Amino acid sequence: MAKPAKPNGGAVGRNPERTRGRILSAALREFAANGFAGARVDAIARRAVINKRMLYHYFGNKEHLFREVLRRKITERQSSAEGLSGDPAESLPFWFKLSCRDTDWVRLLEWEALQGGGKKVIDEKSRRALATRALGRIRKQQALGYLSGEFEPGHLLLAMRSLTTFPMAFPQLTRLFTNRSVSDPHFQRKYAEFLKKFAAAFRPAVGRRNKTNYEN
């Protein structure tokens, strides 16, 4: 029987970008499983098959590593939305389907809420800037007639985030309310259809299509 690979900082370190990617992927799994407070650097190093010294060489400390994990995930999600129209009837099903595939992102946010409450979050300045841009897109959607102008943009954004992530964040309630597992393809298909109809039903006026990315 082959022996499991041992952490090897030297061999892996010959390709810095590859090593960095392995660390970030391992850290994502560890943070998603245990949250920031519960994640252990030695566990991340084992997942990445490197030694702790090399991990600290690349990222300094656990907080810096968590910040990079968040930035990487946000960049990935933004890239996946390129070309997405500003119509919520299209964007809501898209973000729901993405959340079904990207449950690690949902878990990261859940752990952050459980462990941090309403306190400042890691990398708050950059994330607040992203939120400000998202609110700007909500206002544009209101101006184009996709969303009612009578609601505050922040409330609309919060509701839209909830609609697209709640089933994955609370799978037990999804099962109790629908008699379906969130991983059930039938549920995913029907809920995506619901989101499309829901967004269309609450449209105050016929808005013209606007090919502006809507990042989640």
Model-derived segments and spans:
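Helix-turn-helix
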Residues: 22, 26, 30-64, 68
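C-terminal peripheral helix-coil segments that are non-catalytic and often amphipathic
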Residues: 1-6, 94-101, 131-144, 162-216
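Amphipathic alpha-helical packing segments from all-alpha helical-bundle domains
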Residues: 78-82, 118-144, 154-155, 189-193
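Short, basic, alpha-helical segments at the C-terminal edge of helix-turn-helix-like DNA-binding modules
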Residues: 71-76
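Hydrophobic alpha-helical connector segments
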Residues: 79-107, 127, 153-157
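Short coil/turn segments at alpha/beta junctions that flank glycine-rich nucleotide-binding fingerprints
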Residues: 33-37, 102, 144
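Amphipathic alpha-helical segments used for helix-helix packing
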Residues: 100-121, 170-178
